[in-house]
């Protein structure tokens, strides 16, 4: 009697199974709270895995945070994972500590006269977003009349921060009081502050620059104002300066007071009735794609015989006639016309070579960093500029110029401790440490570079052929 074979189980139809239920949990402030915890650990010295030596000072940090914020640290730690890093002597300790605070917290408060030093360090660390925003801040401050040079005994402060509401950068400066750090969820980005002044004192201006994100295709060239050429009569070269001009008329924008929430422990400042001719000013700039441009407005000659060039940058959507001028001494020589072009030496790649400068024998130290200009592109097509005055036709050459001017050697060999300025130099050098030498199985010749070994192996026909045709081993 045959035993019936059991039938295989029939799989359930997929239509019968209910769809799996999923839930999603999201914490919008998770990234900021995580960075705050990392910053607190850094300040307490917990879980730090790298020591940074800057001009004799030792700062503790986390390798993962440094590598994520700076391409310089990313490549340096990738090539040599050492517990202690010594930064070049050109990096100032105070400026680097400020940028380290910016990396961990997303905000930085500093005196305005220290802004060029922070720009210099950010260029060396290849933090191009910070360099771009510092250049924008310098340009906006000069355009609005609030330069770096302090007037009288007033101390100017700047607050550089990243805001989650606008996704950009903002800066506030006030000659009378330190700005209040505000939260994007509790106050309006366009809020204003009223400085306190005694009887007979001038009412200080509160400057607020807010960056608004904008898509690339929505750029509007009509909003950019062309900067006018000016000649500076100051004898000191290589400096950026400016003062707050007194306005002579009412501000064209209607100003409305916005209530603000102050942190605990701080009292609200006394609000004085502002004269109609001196209201606080608010300037807005738009964040554009990082394509630095440059516009040479003219050159002039000082009475002492030293020729200086003034680089003028357009002011954007601001009011006033202020400009940002970089004075570049070119040494004694024939003078050129007021705004006419002059012949300048160029290198093998067609880039301008500015004589003189801020080297060891120069009068000052040149400021290097990418600049972004408005207006029409130059006729020669070199629209990527550096703060030192050089211009380049392509962006990689400009970035390479900034790296080489600092004499930094960030790329080090982990085997022989040799250091190189450029990454491809290290790549070529690492071929010498490829391990065992490549030996030809036919003639026994040995090669260091694998590509040379492959070419020889295709040509080699044995020991006799190699002896007859090769005069060296």
UniProtKB/Swiss-Prot annotation:
Protein name: Zinc finger and BTB domain-containing protein 9
Keywords tagged on the record: DNA-binding, Isopeptide bond, Metal-binding, Nucleus, Repeat, Transcription, Transcription regulation, Ubl conjugation, Zinc, Zinc-finger
Role: May be involved in transcriptional regulation.
Compartments in which it is found: Nucleus
Upper lineage: Eukaryota, Metazoa, Chordata, Craniata, Vertebrata
Entry-linked InterPro entries: BTB/POZ_dom (IPR000210), SKP1/BTB/POZ_sf (IPR011333), Znf_C2H2_sf (IPR036236), Znf_C2H2_type (IPR013087), ZnFinger_BTB_dom_contain (IPR050457)
Pfam families listed in its UniProt record: BTB
Zinc finger region(s), C2H2-type: 411-433, 438-460
Record gene name: ZBTB9
Organism (species): Homo sapiens
């Amino acid at each position: 009697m045959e035993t019936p074979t059991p039938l295989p189980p029939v799989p359930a139809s997929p239509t019968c199974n209910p769809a799996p239920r999923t839930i999603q949990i999201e914490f919008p402030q998770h990234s900021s709270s995580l960075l705050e915890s990392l910053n607190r650990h850094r300040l307490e010295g917990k879980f730090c895995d790298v020591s940074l030596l800057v001009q004799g000072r030792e700062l503790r940090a986390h390798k993962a945070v440094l590598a994520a914020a700076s391409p310089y640290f990313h490549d340096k730690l990738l090539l040599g994972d050492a517990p202690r890093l010594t930064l070049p002597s050109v990096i100032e300790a105070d400026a680097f500590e400020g940028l380290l605070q910016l990396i961990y917290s997303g905000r930085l408060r500093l005196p305005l006269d220290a802004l060029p030093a922070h720009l210099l360090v950010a260029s060396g660390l290849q933090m191009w977003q910070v360099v771009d925003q510092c250049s924008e801040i310098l340009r906006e401050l000069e355009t609005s009349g609030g330069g770096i040079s302090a007037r009288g005994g007033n101390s100017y402060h700047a607050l550089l921060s990243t805001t989650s509401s606008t996704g950009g950068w903002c800066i506030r400066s006030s000659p009378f009081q330190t700005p209040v750090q505000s939260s994007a969820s509790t106050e309006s980005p366009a809020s204003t502050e009223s400085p306190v002044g005694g009887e007979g004192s001038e009412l200080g201006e509160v400057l607020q620059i807010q960056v608004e994100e904008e898509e690339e295709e929505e750029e509007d060239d009509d909003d950019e104002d062309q900067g006018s050429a000016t000649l500076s009569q100051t004898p000191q070269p290589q400096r950026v300066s400016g003062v707050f001009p007194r306005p002579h008329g009412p501000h064209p924008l209607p100003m409305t007071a916005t209530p603000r929430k102050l942190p605990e422990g701080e009292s609200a400042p006394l609000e004085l009735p502002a004269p109609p001719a001196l209201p606080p000013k608010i300037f807005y700039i738009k964040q554009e794609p990082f394509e630095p441009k440059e516009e040479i407005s003219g050159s002039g000659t000082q009475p002492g015989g030293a020729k200086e060039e003034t680089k003028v940058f357009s002011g954007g959507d601001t009011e006033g006639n202020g400009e940002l001028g970089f004075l570049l001494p070119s040494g004694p020589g024939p003078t050129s016309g007021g705004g006419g072009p002059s012949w300048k030496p160029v290198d093998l790649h067609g880039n301008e070579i500015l004589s003189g400068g801020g080297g060891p024998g120069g009068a000052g130290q040149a400021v290097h960093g990418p600049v972004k200009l408005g207006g029409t592109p130059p006729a020669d097509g070199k629209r990527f500029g550096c703060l030192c005055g050089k211009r380049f036709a392509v962006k990689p050459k400009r970035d390479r110029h900034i790296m080489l001017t600092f004499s930094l050697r960030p790329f080090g060999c982990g085997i022989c401790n040799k250091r190189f300025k450029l990454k491809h130099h290290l790549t070529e050098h690492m071929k010498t440490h490829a391990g065992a030498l490549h030996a030809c199985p036919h003639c026994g010749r040995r090669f260091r570079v694998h590509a040379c070994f492959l070419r020889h192996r295709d040509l080699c026909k044995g020991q006799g052929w190699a002896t007859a045709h090769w005069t060296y081993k």
